[in-house]
Curated annotation (Swiss-Prot):
It comes from Mus musculus. The keyword Hydrolase does not apply. This is TNF receptor-associated factor 5. There is a cross-link at residue 318 (Glycyl lysine isopeptide (Lys-Gly) (interchain with G-Cter in ubiquitin)). PANTHER family: TNF RECEPTOR ASSOCIATED FACTOR, TNF RECEPTOR-ASSOCIATED FACTOR 5.
Length: 558
């Protein structure tokens, strides 16, 4: 997500993601400005003595730039005010927004004076330079990049730039001026060139090959070359040759015709010989087919005989076994005629036959049951997927907050940041939260390795408006004030806080068309050096806490 250079220079200006044209009231620090009226001391930083940038006021009443007050705290364990030597207590330092507005509305001269006599407020200084006619800019042509005043760009492009484009007089294409002559002499398809055969005509370069097919000066072979004529000359002279050598050409044609007749006669003889050979081969094939049929029948008979032999062998084995069983039964019958009852044996055999019949019928039913089982398995998988989806939904609802406030616990910070650095998971989303039971559906998005101007150096934190179930009943665009916080886990409440009011003209706060709008927030929310400093306690047990609070003032509850 790219931001413009102007945006990258604003440490805590709230901007939309993917927005290259957003305008914010701010100015470049460490730059000399010529104020219309002499800069009052109350607008100067007590540390760097330059105009206040993002002013903060201490408990003793003195004002410092945001970066200067941070430097004082980082350089000294007990920061001292350089004016009255009072100890600067962190809990008494606050952002002086009133002073900031006054500073941003101070009038300054354009740095391009006296050429530009514009007087603008300090907060719009950079915006003015983007349009100032006397600002030095490079030529838009990347190959040129000559520096000039913005007001002279149009004239430079139309008359002086060596890399400007002009239309070719012949093909009407736009060509860079420095390449125009080479284009005409070597590649322009419509540029007039002389005939390669030096005839009197000039033709467009793209039609040279077409012209050569009709050029009277072109060299070509006599039309009777295929019959043996070896004459070669200009197209205009060949007509005279054809008239003068008509008799010779006819003799060549007759000779060629005689040769063709001889060739045809030889081919007929060869064809008759081949037809005779084909008939002989056909008779041989029929003979082989007849023999093959006989072999097939013989093989079939042999196969039947072999199967009969195998069956006979099997039956012989069974007969021998049955014969042995019969002998045993006869012995038993002879020995115990009064005790043997064969009816029970017959009944048992009949019972087994019925059971076999039932099992054969069960096979078909098993096939049907297998099909039904497959259908039920498919339905069960669908229900499992729906249950998983519902379970995820219940988890979100269970952790949802309906007061317009979100406390987001980000665990495993080091692992997630490493994944962001490696490009696997560049951002993480919080669980949704709501301004009320039927209110706006919102969430937070964090880039642990930074995004845009904060990539690689800062943690970027954004606020996201999501599509909700009651959007049609809510007022749009979203207009509430939003506060983003990084919570201090030491108990000293040294939180990092940034607040902004939703811009009703931004598409980030319109009614969502998709699942969520473009995120809006601070790409340079907190630097990695501050966040990961062991002296601070923003990260504890590899966990940090982020808070998002929405001002519910004037928000009508459904």
């Amino acid at each position: 997500m790219a931001h413009s250079e102007e945006q990258a220079a604003v440490p805590c200006a709230f901007i939309r993601q993917n927005s290259g044209n957003s305008i914010s009231l701010d100015f470049e620090p460490d730059t000399e400005y010529q104020f219309v009226e002499q800069l009052e001391e109350r607008y100067k930083c007590a540390f760097c003595h330059s105009v206040l940038h993002n002013p903060h006021q201490t408990g003793c009443g003195h004002r410092f730039c945001q970066q200067c007050i941070r430097s004082l705290r980082e350089l000294n364990s007990v920061p001292i005010c350089p004016v009255d030597k009072e100890v600067i207590k962190p809990q008494e330092v606050f952002k002086d927004n009133c002073c900031k507005r006054e500073v941003l509305n101070l009038h300054v001269y354009c740095k391009n004076a006296p050429g530009c006599n514009a007087r603008i407020i300090l907060g719009r200084f950079q915006d003015h330079l983007q349009h100032c006619s006397f600002q030095a800019v490079p030529c838009p042509n990347e190959s040129c990049r000559e520096a000039m005043l913005r007001k002279d760009v149009k004239e430079h492009l139309s008359a002086y730039c060596r890399f400007r484009e002009e239309k070719c007089l012949y093909c009407k294409r736009d060509i860079v001026v420095t390449n125009l002559q080479d284009h005409e002499e070597n590649s322009c398809p419509a540029y007039p060139v002389s005939c390669p055969n030096r005839c009197v005509q000039t033709i467009p370069r793209a039609r040279v090959n077409e012209h050569l097919t009709v050029c009277p000066e072109a060299e070509q072979d006599c039309p009777f070359k295929h019959y043996g004529c070896t004459v070669k000359g200009k197209r205009g002279n060949l007509l005279e040759h054809e008239r003068a050598a008509l008799q010779d050409h006819m003799l060549l044609v007759l000779e060629k015709n005689y040769q063709l007749e001889q060739r045809i006669s030889d081919l007929y003889q060869s064809l008759e010989q081949k037809e005779s050979k084909i008939q002989q081969l056909a008779e041989t094939v029929k003979k082989f087919e007849k023999e093959l049929k006989q072999f097939t029948q013989m093989f079939g008979r042999n196969g039947t005989f072999l199967s009969n032999v195998q069956a006979l062998t099997s039956h012989t084995d069974k007969s021998a076994w049955l014969e042995a069983q019969v002998r045993q039964l006869l012995q038993i019958v002879n020995q115990q005629p009064s005790r043997l009852d064969l009816r029970s044996l017959v009944d048992a055999v009949d019972s087994v036959k019925q059971r076999i019949t039932q099992l054969e019928a069960s096979d078909q039913r098993l096939v049907l049951l297998e099909g039904e089982t497959s259908k039920h398995d498919a339905h069960i998988n669908i229900h499992k997927a729906q249950l998983n989806k519902n379970e995820e939904r219940f988890k979100q609802l269970e952790g949802a907050c309906y007061s317009g406030k979100l406390i987001w616990k980000v665990t495993d910070y080091r692992v997630k940041k490493r994944e962001a650095v490696e490009g696997h998971t560049v951002s993480v989303f919080s669980q949704p939260f709501y301004t009320s039971r039927c209110g706006y559906r919102l969430c937070a998005r964090a880039y642990l390795n930074g995004d845009g101007s904060g990539k690689g150096t800062h943690l970027s934190l954004y606020f996201v408006v999501m599509r909700g179930e009651f959007d049609s009943l809510l007022q749009w665009p979203f207009r509430q004030r939003v506060t983003l916080m990084l919570l201090d886990q030491s108990g000293k409440k040294n939180h990092i806080v940034e607040t902004f009011k939703a811009d009703p003209n931004s598409s980030s706060f319109k009614r969502p068309d998709g699942e969520m709008n473009i995120a809006s927030g601070c790409p340079r929310f907190v630097s990695h050096s501050t966040l990961e400093n062991s002296k601070n306690t923003y990260i504890k047990d590899d966990t940090l806490f982020l808070k998002v609070a929405v001002d519910l003032t004037d928000l009508e509850d459904l």
